[in-house]
Amino acid sequence: VPFFAIFNMEVSHESQVWKRANEPLVIHPDSIIPPPYHPDDETTRRDWAVAYSNIHEMDKQVQQFIDEVDEAGLLDETIIIWYSDNGGPMPRQKRELYESGTLVPFMVRFPDGKLAGMVDNDLHMFVDIPATILSLANILPPDYMHGIPFLGKFKGESRNYVYGARDRLDEIVERQTCVRDGRFRYVRNYLPEKSGYMEILSRLNMPMMQNMVRLFKRGKLNKETSRWFEKPPKIEELYDVNNDPHEMKNLIDNPAYSKEVERLRGEMEAWNKCYNPYLGLTEAELREKLWPGGEQPIVEPPVCVKTGTNKIQVKSNT
């Protein structure tokens, strides 16, 4: 009987950096080299060591799932997909539209060793994953899916661009969008009065986050690290990701890249017009759009069809 199962592992989640702070480490903090947007101190290296140790524990949990599939005699018939839901769990990673927050690991294991060792350098988005899973099952993705399959029978054309947005995160209202091609990332800040850093209460449990805030208030952070806490100096940002992987140098005013700015700005505006029409709405305006007059819209109920003994099919247009 075909099966589809999803397992979510929390051990490598942001919150586990402080919740598992006293667990044994598999890497010594002194061996950690923090990225340039983090202060290189004992607190930072310690939290990074916890994060890496959490990933090690997650790897062991993944192995347990694989062993269960093997013991059930299904390993040679099962496609295993593993990926994360955002970039790194550390400050200036999760929730950010930079590479540190949007680049995620993604691995596929086919039962016959197909494509083993292959590295796919094409651009993909999360919306591509459901369509890809259907394609792997030889099912044509429905028209209402925006995703492009990148594996399987219905594999589509490679993307030239990928897009991102952040607006309502935890208890914070923000408004940013981005577009990335094979080399450059363009970011638009719609609330330039806000800094990149957001005071998210749960994240302030992380010792490293507490330390960064304290150092910034004392003027002890270097230019690269403190930039995250300051108001964006520009409404627009452009980064050469290939040559500046941590996206520390904003090229938006460099005339040598004016054509890239114009091209990516146009792509961003076209994407917003098509997929992000409520971008500029206030909370009250958005609520009225979703629930006119404060009334919850009634959606079409699902349809259940009996397809065989002990089998039903549930369909819904919404």
Which residue ranges define each predicted feature?
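Beta-strand elements within well-structured catalytic alpha/beta cores of enzymes
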Residues: F4-N8, M58, V62, V69, ...
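Polar, surface-exposed loop/tail segments
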Residues: D76-E77, M118-D181, K249-N250, Y257-G266, ...
